[in-house]
């Protein structure tokens, strides 16, 4: 079962959390999160594609809850693996690499104590999950300008056009230089907000 789900929308000061009920049933938690996730065009997670979303789909099916919507995802594990050669691609390591505190320490005993209805353990579990969300947010925005291989154009998705940064959706951009490709001359841009460089997919006429 899912003990808690911690989440955070961009612009919030701190995460929020959903917790299983007093009977350790996660059906209400799942139904609430399905409504929440349906509000956003993009979901960001660390190993979210292979773990978090699959676990939630399995639990919604087992609980006959409302199924998760089909969402666009950005997975920081895939992003770092596809764009960088690092010593480790774990969230804790990437967080510490950029000078943050990393994940909270925990062990298997915490899960045992939570299942025994230990309130102090449950509080620690929620703090652990919320800390993960904060580290994920910091790692994602720090790493984004250095990831040329993204599954989507963020600006086009959020603003509805490509005249913006594909990494942070900012329109605060300047021309950098032109690039000659096999299919024609293309403009390279530089984002003044996140620092990203990219080449326009459209040919210069």
Segment roles from a protein language model:
Residues 1-11:
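Acidic, metal-ligating active-site segments
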Residues 158-162, 185-186:
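Flanking scaffold residues of small Cys/His-coordinated metal-binding clusters
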Residues 163-168, 191-194:
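Short cysteine-rich clusters marking metal-coordination/redox-active sites
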Residues 44, 91-159:
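Acidic, Mg2+-coordinating catalytic module of metal-dependent nucleases/exonucleases
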Residues 169-189:
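Short recognition patches in nucleic-acid-associated and regulatory proteins
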Residues 66-71, 100-109, 175:
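Short, surface-exposed acidic
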Residues 192-205:
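Short metal-binding segments enriched for Cys and/or His
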Residues 11-93:
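Conserved DEDDh/DEDDy metal-dependent 3′-5′ exonuclease domain
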């Amino acid at each position: 079962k899912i003990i808690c789900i911690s989440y955070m929308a961009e612009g919030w000061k701190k995460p929020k959390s959903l917790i299983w009920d007093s009977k350790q049933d996660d059906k209400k938690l799942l139904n609430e999160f399905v409504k929440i996730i349906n509000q956003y065009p993009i979901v960001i997670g660390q190993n979210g594609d292979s773990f978090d979303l699959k676990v939630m789909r399995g639990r919604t099916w087992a609980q006959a809850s409302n199924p998760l919507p089909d969402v666009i995802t950005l997975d920081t594990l895939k992003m770092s693996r596809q764009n960088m050669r690092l010593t480790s691609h774990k969230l804790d390591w990437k967080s510490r690499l950029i000078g943050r505190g990393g994940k909270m320490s925990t062990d298997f005993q915490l899960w045992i104590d939570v299942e025994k209805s230990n309130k102090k353990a449950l509080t620690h579990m929620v703090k652990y999950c919320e800390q993960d969300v904060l580290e994920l947010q910091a790692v994602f925005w720090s790493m984004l300008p250095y990831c040329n291989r993204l599954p989507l154009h963020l600006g086009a998705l959020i603003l509805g056009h490509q005249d913006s940064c594909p990494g942070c959706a900012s329109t605060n951009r300047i021309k950098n230089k032109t690039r000659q490709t096999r299919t024609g001359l293309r403009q390279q841009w530089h984002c003044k907000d996140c620092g990203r460089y990219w080449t326009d997919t459209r040919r210069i006429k």
